Amino acid sequence: MAVRVVVGTQWGDEGKGKYIDMLAEQSDIIVRFSGGNNAGHTIVANGVKYALHLIPSGILHTDKTCIIGNGVVVDPAVLLQEMKGLNERGVTTDHLLISDRAHLVMPYHKELDVLQEKFRGSDSIGTTKRGIGPCYVDKIERSGIRMCDLIDENEFIRKVKANLKLKNLIIERVYGGEPFEAEPIIKEYLGYAEQLKKYITDTTCILADAVDEGKNILFEGAQANFLDVDFGTYPYVTSSNPIAGGVCTGSGLGPVYVDEVYGVLKAYTSRVGAGPFPTEQNNEIGDTIRELGLEYGTTTGRPRRCGWLDTVMIKYTAKINSLTALAINHVDTIGKLKEIKLCVGYKKDGQIIRTFPASLNELAKCEPVYEVFEPWNEDISNVKLFSDLPQNAQKYLNRIEELVGVKIGLIGVGKDREQIIKVF
């Protein structure tokens, strides 16, 4: 039995889907454990591009069980649309299961998300306005509606009506918005219930049984460490815990069963939306990285901010997640630049530091300290062995390992899931 976890080490969009898809081949069960459809994975298989937002990337493997865990918040309309899109392309979703403890994103969550961002003005967080944050708020304040409620008609109706009493007051009196009527929501969501009920079950018990049976389980992280509500660049974060620790709370599996944790990173850094970014290159270099790496959001289509790889961040992530291996993408992309810089520390108040500050005010005082590397400018898309990489690429990767303190196990040299060097 092997229980593996794949997490992002930066601000998301690191290319986790490709490695998840590869590791899924060795797994019996693939689990999504946090976030909602504010995250996105892109997989390229046999030249076909699949963009997934809720369904685990392992769905392409029809002999595997795919689970949406209790830590995920589910917009049923989005989920059903995603299922339909897969079905239309010949991919079955019959092997998908949804935790009966997962919370539902409701129409008023999405409306509140929009109204709150508008209200914040210049202090807006930069949410995707998909209702994820307000849904997690309801979960924590114990007024959320779960999948088990969706398939219990009387309970669902009761909860919707009870919630709207307060939600409509907030929408109308605080934000000046239009109130919701209960009946249209009830009718819409009971329609979703009819379509989804066969997928909804107690997935915690299924995972416990799988462990007892010695099955291989893969936990698919969405987003990344620096979007974590506790360990990210707060408040420019998501509303959940997409770190390895979130596996346990987002699925019900105990921590002693986790064997391996892969941390996925790019050979540079990117992020979408507002928030600090110490190594950002708001210049021609950043523009070049964006174009070479096709850095546009899977979910939003927004251009991503781009900059140099920051090993202070990656080392911090390695500690938080107990990483056992790194998986690095875009080694082919970064090698095309005229020169490559690697952040090895920060200079703050005249001192060199190698830790990541919690305070954004303190982080703003940090100036990246760089080492410069020569590019390789070679086509490495078909390289299968680390030793066959250009010497300049090997030097860059070896230095990353040295600074982070974790070995690189997987190296992405192209978009396709087959374009991976397996170091160990």
Curated annotation (Swiss-Prot):
Q: Which SUPFAM superfamilies match?
A: P-loop containing nucleoside triphosphate hydrolases (SSF52540)
The UniProt keyword set, sorted, is: Cytoplasm, GTP-binding, Ligase, Magnesium, Metal-binding, Nucleotide-binding, Purine biosynthesis
Q: What is its EC number?
A: 6.3.4.4
Active-site residues from the entry: D13 (proton acceptor), H41 (proton donor)
Query: According to its UniProt record, where is this protein located?
Result: Cytoplasm
What GO terms describe the biological role, i.e. biological process, of this protein?
'de novo' AMP biosynthetic process; IMP metabolic process
What subunit structure does UniProt give? Homodimer.
Q: What is this protein called?
A: Adenylosuccinate synthetase
Native organism: Ruminiclostridium cellulolyticum (strain ATCC 35319 / DSM 5812 / JCM 6584 / H10) (Clostridium cellulolyticum)
Encoding gene, per UniProt annotation: purA
